[in-house]
Amino acid sequence: MGKKDKSKENKKGFRLFGKKRANRKDKKKNERPEICLSLSCTNIESLKEQIEEYKDCCQIVEWCVDSTLGSDDYTQEEFKTVLTEIKKLCKGKKLIVDYKGNEEVGNRIQRWAMGIADIIDIDADNSRLKEMVKEAKRKRTKTLISYHVFDRMPSRDEIATQFVKMERNGGDILKIACFASKESESYEILEAACSYTQLANHKPIVAIAMGEEGQASRICAGDFGSVITYACGSTPTAPGQFNARDLSRY
């Protein structure tokens, strides 16, 4: 057998589309997506601890509210008090509020977050999507419209079409995350994302291939137009996520 080409692998051993990746600090500024520390914590104390531990490794913090026990029962005053505390703790980092689950509860939480959080993550299939986007704009809060496929990798055409569809709904940032069952599928979603960014007046995008076979997409996303790449604290919030400290080294 011939010698393995080490230049085409990262420390985890997976190939990066035939390119040797530059160290993160050596890459051009416009090629480096911001790292979002995605936190799925069962209680507020743990959430605050994770922010303190990893805030030097990220530019954005995402609170996955549905993972916090009792979050469905928050009153508006309780939620805004907690969110304000978290926002202060982030100290200049952008804050995303995300809620996956019951749409009615999620929309209520997201409305309360407007004006405090910098960005709210709204599912592309939300029945009140346009209404939520308009309300967020009135309250000067950016919207990230997200679309997830957890069991397959759609075709490039499907992905590109979905980006355009989300753009028409008025989101400020468009995110698509799909599961990769083989490494080559990471290339599919990144190429589709890159094609979308060639369009005039395109919106900022995030493209992620979930799963272990999609990990390369989390490192080189910026080369294909993504403005954000997601990482975790002590516990992954999606398949294939890197720890924020590890990802920040690229």
Question: Can you say where each PLM-predicted feature lies in the sequence?
Answer:
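N-terminal acidic, proline/glycine-rich, low-complexity intrinsically disordered segments
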Residues: 1-6
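Short beta-strand/loop segments at the ligand-binding rim of alpha/beta enzyme cores
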Residues: 31-37, 90-100, 139-149, 201-206
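Short, acidic/polar
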Residues: 42-54, 104-111, 155-165
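Conserved N-terminal beta1-alpha1 strand-loop-helix module at the mouth
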Residues: 11-95, 102-103
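Catalytic beta/alpha-barrel core
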Residues: 40, 60-71, 96-102, 117-129, ...
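Catalytic alpha/beta core domains of metabolic enzymes, predominantly
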Residues: 126-250
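Short amphipathic alpha-helical segments and helix-helix/interface helices
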Residues: 51, 80-87, 109-114, 129-134, ...
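Well-ordered, non-membrane alpha-helical segments in soluble/globular domains
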Residues: 73-84, 104-108, 159-160, 186, ...
